Amino acid sequence: MKRKILLTMTLFALAATLGFAKKPAERWSEEKANAWMAEQGWIVGCDYVCATAINQIEMWQAETFDPATMDKEMGWAEGLGFNTVRVFLSDLVYTADPKGFKARFEEFLGIIEKHHIRAIVTFWTNGGKCKNPKLGKQPESVQGVHNSQWCMVPGTEVVNDPTKWHELEVMVKDIIKTYKNDDRILFWCLYNEPQNTQRGVKKTLPLMKETFRWAREINPSQPLTAPIWEIPSSLTPQMPTVTWVWENSDIISFHCYKEPDYLEKFIKLLLPYNRPLVCTEYMGRPKSTFKECMPILKKYNVGAINFGLTAGKCNFHLQWTSKAGDPEPKVWFHDIFRLDGTPYSQEEVDFIREMTGVSKK
């Protein structure tokens, strides 16, 4: 009850600031979006989960928040020439303690700013293997399993029940309002891979529409987007979702773990939208590699955000199909560094540095 009262007070405070009848801002024009992109330079970086965190809860809750490791890893990212990291938030951590969550998020932003890095902030995602996620001590990593305890946010039950979206609205509006003019935020990724309906989620599109509306009411200086995870076919039931995303995002984001030819085909499909393009997930060896994909992304000035930095608790370096007890693979799937900071492949690291230009400094 205390938590609900606190969240209600937060929403009323936001409403008083914004005005109850405030009309949502409109989608950015092509000219505004492209002018924004021209100011950024080439966007390059990684999807980031702290190596000591098994999921979003462990990354952000007070008991396990690990700024020392974050600082160390952001130093490695800076050394690669990365200027961006994409992070995933936790509604459970925020709702339990909005003030504490925001204090830790602010500390994280201070760390990345120190290393000349900006954040892509992701709110919701339908992917996850952790059943009934709860605050406190998190389940242990399962040896041999890729991303064994990742959390759906906010989860199937909440996504499918609009009466429970009130707390989500509070979170979205509070965080975006706080950072709406903050240069440390590159852009807002409101819903990760909304095409993903494999875990019983039925109201992704309605929730995504509402989340965009909440964000538009705040009208941040940073663009809004949601990434598509594959080229849609004429037979996909997700076409309404894909169409809505591409017609309402300020910038176009997408994911691609397939071969370089497919990546270039995907990019060419999106170019007619005449909006900035950012690939917010790629690089899954052996099909999608830095050496083959980074030059294509840079050629078209498409933002390049590979998945993973350090092979930590999440086991991102293992294949999606890995099973409990599987041995360490000779060929990593994601990630760049081992826990001690040594590269999985020095040749890859040298290539990344060449592509980002830091090898010439």
Regions found by a protein language model. Give the residues of each.
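Active-site mouth of glycoside hydrolases
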Residues: 23-249, 255, 260-262, 273, ...
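Catalytic His-Asp charge-relay segment
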Residues: 276-278
